[in-house]
């Protein structure tokens, strides 16, 4: 394991790409988190502080000096991408191209977009690339769609772009260019790299006590990936199955559903936290996939109960108070 202080300029460089692994939680920073980050860094910029630290970035090195999985710090890293994308849009050339290279570089010969510096979870990446990195407008129709689906990560991305736009609109272009330069050259993170998924997994659990606490669903999902053995060829398949569960139930209601599922399986009162109650259940299962299959079946029944979708009149009447 290695740790070093690095400027944002060395983090968001043309040679390095980052991916959010499937076992990570989705983007969840709220408007207040973004306002605080912007306000704190702007205050340091105005005070001409020599350096300003914004926390740690813990990664697994998949390709030396080129590709990293983000274990901790993805909320800040994603938000930095939002900020630089909007700073790019707010300034003129040549600063626009300079900042654009930090988030979505282009081939200078063909003008085609290349691989983004950051890739989010599969479910969120298309929205992130189109509406954050490529600055495609988030129309009212798109906003209504993500609201109706209660798609929390996309709602957070959309809302936080609005926070950043409001913040930048109050400053002139010269100030924004100087602020962007300060962000790149005077703002630091502690950059930690490990080559081992097992080491990263231990760090992931230890770091749950810091920052935004992980939900029980996040921790249960993490245990499933641990049972799988980390970044195997099966991880994408497991991630897709979990995403289908999230979409069916809704991220905001997932903890509640998992509590009901545990009660229906064990038929005993919980004595520990929800994710601790799930640990022996996951360990006793044949595979993570068979365990998730059982949860998926339970989810379908749960949704029928929630929707009171039974033909039997007596059943509908008994479920109505729930």
What residue ranges belong to the model's regions?
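Short alpha-helix boundary/capping and kink motifs at helix termini
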Residues: 1-71, 75, 81, 177-178, ...
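Generic structural "secondary-structure junction" signal
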Residues: 13-14, 20-25, 29-31, 55-60, ...
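Hydrophobic, Leu/Ile/Phe/Ala-enriched alpha-helical segments that form helix-helix packing faces
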Residues: 41-45, 91, 168
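A short beta-strand motif that forms part of the nucleic acid-binding face
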Residues: 72, 83-84, 205-207
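Short active-site loop/helix that positions an aromatic residue
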Residues: 76-93
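Short, polar/flexible loop-turn hinges at active-site or ligand-entry regions and domain interfaces
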Residues: 90-95, 210-214
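Extended charged low-complexity segments that act as oligomerization/scaffolding linkers
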Residues: 98-137
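Polyanionic (Asp/Glu-rich) segments that form extended negatively charged tracts
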Residues: 123-322
């Amino acid at each position: 394991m290695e740790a070093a202080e690095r400027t944002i300029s060395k983090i968001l460089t043309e040679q390095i790409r980052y991916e959010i692994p499937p076992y990570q939680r989705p983007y969840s920073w709220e408007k207040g988190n973004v306002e605080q980050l912007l306000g704190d860094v702007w205050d340091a910029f105005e005070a001409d502080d020599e350096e300003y630290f914004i926390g740690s970035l813990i990664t697994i090195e998949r390709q030396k000096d080129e590709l990293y999985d983000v274990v901790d710090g993805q909320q800040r890293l994603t938000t930095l991408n939002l900020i630089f994308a909007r700073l790019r849009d707010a300034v003129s050339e040549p600063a626009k191209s300079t900042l654009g290279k930090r988030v979505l570089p282009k081939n200078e010969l063909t003008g085609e977009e290349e691989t983004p510096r950051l890739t989010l979870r599969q479910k969120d990446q298309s929205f992130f690339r189109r509406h954050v990195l490529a600055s495609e407008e988030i129309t009212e129709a798109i906003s209504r769609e993500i609201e109706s689906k209660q798609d929390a990560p996309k709602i957070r991305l959309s809302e936080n772009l609005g926070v950043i736009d409001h913040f930048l609109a109050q400053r002139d272009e010269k100030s924004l260019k100087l602020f962007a330069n300060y962000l790149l050259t005077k703002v630091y993170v502690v950059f930690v790299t490990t080559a081992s998924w097992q080491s990263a997994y231990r760090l992931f659990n230890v770091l749950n006590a810091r920052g935004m606490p992980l939900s029980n669903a996040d921790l249960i999902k993490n245990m499933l990936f641990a049972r799988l053995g980390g970044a195997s060829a099966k991880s994408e398949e497991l991630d897709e199955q979990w995403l289908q569960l999230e979409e069916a139930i809704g991220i905001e209601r997932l903890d509640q559903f998992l509590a009901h599922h545990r009660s229906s399986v064990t038929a005993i009162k919980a004595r520990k936290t929800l994710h601790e109650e799930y640990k022996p259940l996951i360990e006793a299962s044949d595979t993570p996939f068979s365990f998730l299959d059982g949860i998926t079946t339970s989810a379908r029944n749960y949704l029928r109960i929630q929707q009171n979708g039974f033909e039997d009149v007596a059943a509908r009447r008994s479920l109505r108070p729930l």
